[in-house]
Structures are given as C-alpha cells and as structure tokens.
Amino acid sequence: MARLDTALRGVGHPGLFITVYDSDIVTEANIGRQLFSPSDIGLNKAQCLVTRMNNFFGNDWKAVPDIYPAALKDARRDNLANITITCTDNIKSRLDLWNILKAVPVSEYRSHETPLYWMDFGNTQDTGQVILGTVPKKIKQPASKLYETVESLKVITRYVKYARVKEKDSGPSCSLAEALEKQDLFINSTLAQLGCNILWKMFRNGMIEHYGLYLNLSTLKMNPIPV
C-alpha cells in the first residue's frame, strides 16, 4: 500500500491516508512469513508496521492497536473510509463489518467518510481469493461508448454464506514451522500484491476489468473474476 501511495503521488494523485487496525502482537511465528524481525517481538502489529512505513516513506498514516468496531453504535467518523480492506481469519468480524458498512447512509461520494468499496482477502494454506465489492447498492458510473459499465459489485459476504459455515479457531501458532503448516510462506504476500494491483488499475486508469481473483499457489493457477 505504501508503494501504491508513492506511485500515485508520482503521477499527480493526492495519495492515500490509511488507518490500520490490529489488536495482535508480533510473535516468533510471524518472523519470516511476514516482514517482522526478532526485535519486533512483543510489539503491536499495526503500530510496528505503520511506524516503519511512516519513517520509510514520510507518511502520517495511523495505527490503532485494537480491533475495528463491531457495531455501528461504537464506530466514530474517523473509523469510516471510502475503501475498507480486510485480511481476517474470523468470520464474525466480516459479518460485523458488513453490517456497519451497509448501515452508513451515503451522503456524497466526495466525503472520505462514505464507505464505497470493500476489498476482502482470504486464504487457506496455499489457496486464497481477493474480492472487491461495492458497499452502496449502486455507484453511478460515467456514460461510455466503449464499455458497458457496472454500478454494483458483489462483496465477499454475498459470495459466501458465512452463516452456514461452522468456524473452528485454529489458535495461535507457537513457531514458524507450525505457522507454515497453516499458511504457506508466500500465500499472503502474493494475494496482497495481486489485490493492490486491482486498486492500482482502479486509481490509475479510472476503471477495472476484473474485481477479484482466485489463486492456487500450489498449482500456480489464478482465475480472475471479470466485471
């Protein structure tokens, strides 16, 4: 996201302001799979990463060492954004977030507090998906003679009937070897790159032809989801 922000600024875009929410701390199991070092152990993940990105790129992004509000009554104006990105292994948090986003009244698209898009990342050990959906029922698109525009994209909760899924908490991993049994080494970073590429196309070109993808890292196959 920091590279995306830097590239956008380089082509005249005002850039991004990002707030990261995470209540977890860095453990030994995170070293190697993610960009954490042994000196980061014990630090809050959000604060650690945002501080590093701010120092490296000169940004003023915000870190919140807590979970995202679980209900609209607990959310403040600064909890809302035009694009919400989730990378969670918890089904309930997805459902809670969707209930919040769809309950926020759409005032105007130019307000940074109006939820417009929700991008969700999910994965198993070596497979995963990225889905970019629209929060409002419709987002008005400009008239085009070249393309057939689409005003609505399905969010992840409309793809998957999470209410029917029985969630089992796998618990925290105590070592890198144990963590790799649950998530392969490059599945998270590969999905992150591909998801950011969708956002890059959207910002850079003002349009996207694919709003998601399915990835199988063991077979090196990827299936894009066309608009």
Predicted regions span which residues?
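Glycine-rich phosphate/adenylate-binding loop
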Residues: T6, T88-V227
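Conserved RecA-like P-loop NTPase ATPase core
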Residues: D24, I85, C196
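A structured beta-alpha segment of the ubiquitous adenosine-cofactor-binding alpha/beta core
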Residues: L43-A81, T88-L95
